[in-house]
């Protein structure tokens, strides 16, 4: 079984790459492989020009200062038996970055940066709300001045109003500290708000990658189009006229994935004898926009009938070996 299979992408310094897809598509597994919390069974992970795939624990130690992670559940990701000061300071102490007084001062500065009272240094996690706990998680990730932060659905467990606060905080911190984010989510509105580029995954594969505005205005892969058609829009009249594309069935099991294109059992544009026989490469369209589909969407939006019919036949777009920036 391969939870993540043959994906290739790059992230530029200072940008935010949004990663979307249904539950079980491999987003979190990919994040843990990037962080070397899981060891990939093939391929390689390159960070800042260095292959870190097979580095030992001792060799990874200095690199771990430069890449941190914000976890999904603010209730489970903080040790309930430890005070906030200890939680945020742990990375500083592991890497021996300062005296006790300097560490305490740094932690209090970080709490203030993320919008919490520095005097709450000695409180326990249960004394904070969900949004405040996630701010503590952000402070912990910032403690050692990393270059890259992998955000694994950091707002999915929060109320909508609190989600906006955390997203705005992450954007402000990126501007202030020059951070690079890999931002994983299943909410397309959240991803649109924070991302520079968006990568869509399905059953362990990358099916589309493009600049944010381009992927929302001109999706090429039918799966991306189906996801976008389900996003609520604030115009009631337009919402009544639009008919979401309903995908039949559930995501297949990665233990026994479909042949060729993994989306073909649910795809409205499925062509028997092609989609189930030949796996589509990542076709390159323009401006770094790539999509893995033999019969891509010609324009957007489409009617339900147009969505199910490819008028141009198989794509003549150039295939690319990997999803490049």
Regions found by a protein language model. Give the residues of each.
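ABC transporter nucleotide-binding domains
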Residues: 1-218, 229, 291-292, 297-325
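Charged, flexible cofactor/metal-binding loops and thiol motifs
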Residues: 211-319
